[in-house]
Regions:
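N-terminal accessory/interface modules of nucleic-acid-binding and processing proteins
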Residues: 1-287, 291-298, 307, 336-343
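Long, low-complexity intrinsically disordered regions
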Residues: 290-335
Length: 343
């Protein structure tokens, strides 16, 4: 395990350097990270290194117990750091494409997709959570949301970036210019993740110059600085989008139930059959409540984040970015909802 851990540590280091080489490399990473937005930054980087096309990853136990899905034979796990295990330990994720349904029925994997019917509700929720959004189209609203979210939260991360610019291209700059670069790149990176995850064409909204600043983050510490901030803030916004879509879907289901019940009642009344009450009782659809939602505390996450993921003579520390979210996409939320249902 020690040898494997060192290999993954080196992979993490090399991948971090690679994604900061140029704007295209950074955009490639962001395109992958937005699909597994509930993962920590260090996990997103290792997922990108091993399975850049991964859509929704989870541990084998989660696939088996929560989704009744089984990992395909000979599938190779995605190694990531395990902060909850002993020092210098790894855990393994498998993508949904590595799994298949069990014999006794599987739970749907909740991977949301943006649709035109969700857009208005999404924009209203983002405006409510992150400040007024003046735009009337989704892409512009996402850009505004990214800017607002970064403005509100980046200072928590910047205070730590200032202490780790040694040997980077940021080292000779004063605090003001470092902050300008950091804020600009973070806002563009968060916006890219939101737009990409919502299925819009990023080429229509970004060019190379929007990410030219990434080359200044050319040390492990500064790569962590921009990566962690981008990952945390984008996750916060994408969670809001996900919940908004769920709310619309549940409202549509409730509306369909109501319509079906009214139609059945009218049909029964017309037939004037005395057994209709028993029939309706048997066929009544029980309405379900919504999923509860807990917004991440961005300040706490910034203070206890993967700044502990440092490079030293021995490699990466066993400590990793603090988070209670081990599952990306919408898998983690489905797990918690299932647990509440069993309680």
């Amino acid at each position: 395990m020690a040898a494997k851990y060192q290999l993954i540590t080196e992979l993490y280091r090399r991948t971090g350097v690679a994604v900061a080489k140029n704007p295209q490399a950074w955009q490639g990473f962001l395109s992958s990270a937005c699909r597994n937005y509930k993962c920590r930054f260090d996990e997103q980087l290792l997922i990108y290194a091993q399975r850049p096309d991964a859509v929704a990853v989870a541990k084998l136990e989660t696939w088996n117990r929560q989704f009744k899905r089984w990992v395909n034979k000979d599938s190779k796990g995605i190694a990531v750091f395990d902060p909850k295990g002993r020092r210098n330990t790894l855990k393994y994720y498998f993508d949904v494409s590595d799994t298949h349904e069990g014999y006794y029925g599987s739970r749907p994997v909740p991977i949301w997709q943006m649709d035109e019917r969700y857009e208005q509700a999404v924009m209203e929720r983002l405006s409510d959570r992150f400040g007024d959004v003046e735009s009337t189209d989704l892409a512009s609203a996402l850009m505004e949301t990214a800017k607002n979210a970064v403005e509100d939260n980046l200072q928590d991360y910047f205070s730590q970036l200032k202490d780790c610019t040694k040997d980077s291209f940021l080292e000779e700059l004063d605090d003001f210019n470092i902050e300008v670069i950091y804020r600009r790149l973070a806002a563009n990176s968060v916006a890219f993740m939101l737009i990409s995850r919502c299925g819009l064409d990023t080429n229509e909204f970004f060019d190379r110059e929007d990410f030219a600043d990434i080359v200044n983050f050319n040390t492990p510490a500064t790569i962590n600085a921009i990566g962690i901030a981008t990952s945390d803030i984008a996750e916060m916004a994408l969670r809001e989008i996900s919940q908004s879509i769920r709310n619309v879907q549940m409202a549509e289901k409730d509306q369909n139930r109501t319509f079906a019940q009214r139609t059945q009642a009218q049909y029964d009344k017309g037939r004037q059959q005395p057994e209709r009450s028993e029939y309706n009782e048997r066929n009544h659809l029980q309405q379900t409540g919504g999923l509860s939602y807990s917004r991440p505390n961005i300040t706490d996450r910034a203070r206890a984040s993967a700044w502990q993921v440092r490079f030293d003579a021995q490699g990466l520390s066993g400590e990793a970015q603090a988070s209670d979210l081990s599952q990306p996409a919408d898998i983690g939320q489905a797990e918690r909802a299932s647990a509440r249902g069993r309680a």
